[in-house]
């Protein structure tokens, strides 16, 4: 992402933080854990990383299921909203994952963040490196779409118009992940009148 687009994206997320949780999309995504968590192995001895955590749509319910959650994002405004919720076993981390992580995690979870990252192969390598051996990967994002989901794609920091999950699976395999699979997991109803499917990509380090 060039500097102009990077700044535009940062401004978008800063402005969006106040209204994000009131949006229709956010309210719909609040139901995602009901579909996602039963597909994972979760217990109180685990420490999970929520990549692109935003205001905590996954981090907060996940914290009820595991021992510790690290909520990672590059948006200070989004993370401030999450910090205000004062969930004791959520650690807030404003950090660029490409700079590396010191902690090793039991699992990495992410929802609707991948399409904002330009270098997906490198991201997958970083996620693999931060997982313990056998650690779980659970990534949720849009199937390939025509650009209508976000509309102002450049202004909203969109790097990919969704994904072909088979291609993403192959990239994850190249990054070192094993036992990979994907499935349709959720649909989002957009204000434009269209429905957009989401997939879940799962694997193990």
What are these regions (language model features)?
Residues 1-41, 58, 78-81:
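Conserved class I S-adenosyl-L-methionine
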Residues 49-99:
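Class I SAM-dependent methyltransferase SAM/SAH-binding core
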Residues 201-205:
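C-terminal lobe and adjacent flexible extensions of AdoMet/dcAdoMet transferase-like proteins
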């Amino acid at each position: 992402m060039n500097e102009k687009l990077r700044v535009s994206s940062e401004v978008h997320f800063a402005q969006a933080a106040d209204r994000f949780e009131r949006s229709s999309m956010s309210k719909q995504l609040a139901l995602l854990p009901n579909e996602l968590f039963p597909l994972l192995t979760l217990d109180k001895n685990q420490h999970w990383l929520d990549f692109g955590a935003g205001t905590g749509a996954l981090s907060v319910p996940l914290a009820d299921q595991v021992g510790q959650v690290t909520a990672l994002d590059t948006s200070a405004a989004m993370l401030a909203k999450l910090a205000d919720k004062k969930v004791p076993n959520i650690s807030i981390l404003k950090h660029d994952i490409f700079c590396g992580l010191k902690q090793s995690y039991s699992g990495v979870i992410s929802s609707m963040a991948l399409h904002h990252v330009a270098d997906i192969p490198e991201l997958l390598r970083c996620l693999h490196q931060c997982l313990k051996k056998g650690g779980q990967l659970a990534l949720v994002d849009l199937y390939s779409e025509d650009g209508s989901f976000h509309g102002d794609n450049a202004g909203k920091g969109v790097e990919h118009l969704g994904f072909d999950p088979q291609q993403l699976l192959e990239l994850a395999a190249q990054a070192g992940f094993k036992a990979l699979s994907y499935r349709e997991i959720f649909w989002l109803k957009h204000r434009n009148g269209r429905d957009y499917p989401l997939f879940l990509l799962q694997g193990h380090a």
